[in-house]
């Protein structure tokens, strides 16, 4: 049990997808203007990562890994296309659910909801799972933790950006300029976790 708690804390803080690996920056910067919208996208990313990482773990270990289907057959060259296909299917299902049951959130996320399909944080989580050879339970914990870490980062950035609307930012830094500086400072803060051994 300690191993799973350690993996969860590590994936949320120490190896944060957004602030340690800088994955998923497109949606991270574009949707982080309001806390409510960024929280909704964060929940969507948590759901997709929590499902996509373990499902792709099963696909990899039962189908794509060397000697998984047939002795001597290695289908690992199909990793990228298969993982992206699974992620795309999951995002489409999530999009239909949000459209049906949460129309305001669906409209607020707009084009960024289908872009979760190509969000490199999702694909990065799946790739790290394969690279680190996680079992199914570890992949569930890692997917959930990575999603929560990404959501924590985007909600924190949105909160800071909402407060910055009322501050006196120099004209040359308004917009993305001050946002990049803010993200850099947040990343420095998360770097302080890098020395933690779990």
Swiss-Prot record:
Catalytic activity line of the entry: a ubiquinone + n Na(+)(in) + NADH + H(+) = a ubiquinol + n Na(+)(out) + NAD(+)
The protein's Enzyme Commission number: 7.2.1.1
Keyword terms, alphabetized: Cell inner membrane, Cell membrane, Ion transport, Membrane, NAD, Sodium, Sodium transport, Translocase, Transmembrane, Transmembrane helix, Transport, Ubiquinone
The keyword Cell inner membrane belongs to this UniProt entry's keyword annotation: yes
Membrane-spanning residues: 11-31, 39-59, 77-97, 110-130, 140-160, 176-196
GO molecular function, a single term: oxidoreductase activity, acting on NAD(P)H, quinone or similar compound as acceptor
Record membrane topology: Multi-pass membrane protein
Enzyme class at the top of the EC tree: translocase
Biological processes, Gene Ontology terms: respiratory electron transport chain; sodium ion transport
One Gene Ontology cellular component: Gram-negative-bacterium-type cell wall
Localization, UniProt: Cell inner membrane
Keyword Cell inner membrane on entry: yes
Subunit structure as annotated in this protein's UniProt entry: Composed of six subunits; NqrA, NqrB, NqrC, NqrD, NqrE and NqrF.
HAMAP family for the chain: NqrE
Family: Belongs to the NqrDE/RnfAE family.
Record's function text: NQR complex catalyzes the reduction of ubiquinone-1 to ubiquinol by two successive reactions, coupled with the transport of Na(+) ions from the cytoplasm to the periplasm. NqrA to NqrE are probably involved in the second step, the conversion of ubisemiquinone to ubiquinol.
Protein name, as recorded: Na(+)-translocating NADH-quinone reductase subunit E
Natural source organism: Vibrio parahaemolyticus serotype O3:K6 (strain RIMD 2210633)
């Amino acid at each position: 049990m300690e191993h799973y708690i350690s993996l969860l804390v590590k994936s949320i803080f120490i190896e944060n997808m957004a602030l340690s690996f800088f994955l998923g920056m497109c949606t991270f910067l574009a949707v982080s203007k309001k806390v409510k919208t960024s929280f909704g996208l964060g929940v969507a990313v948590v759901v997709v990562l929590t499902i996509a990482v373990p499902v792709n773990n099963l696909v990899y270990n039962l189908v794509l890994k060397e000697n998984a289907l047939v002795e001597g057959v290695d289908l690992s060259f199909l990793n990228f296309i298969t993982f992206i296909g699974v992620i795309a299917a999951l995002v489409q299902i999530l999009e239909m659910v949000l459209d049906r049951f949460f129309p305001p959130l669906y409209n607020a996320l707009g084009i960024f909801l289908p872009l979760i399909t190509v969000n490199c944080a999702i694909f990065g989580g799946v790739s790290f799972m394969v690279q680190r050879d996680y079992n199914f339970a570890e992949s569930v914990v890692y997917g959930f933790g990575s999603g929560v870490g990404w959501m924590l980062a985007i909600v924190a950035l949105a909160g800071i950006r909402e407060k910055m609307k009322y501050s006196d930012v120099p004209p040359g830094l308004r917009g993305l300029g001050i946002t990049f500086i803010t993200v850099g400072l947040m990343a420095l803060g998360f770097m302080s976790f890098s020395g933690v051994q779990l």
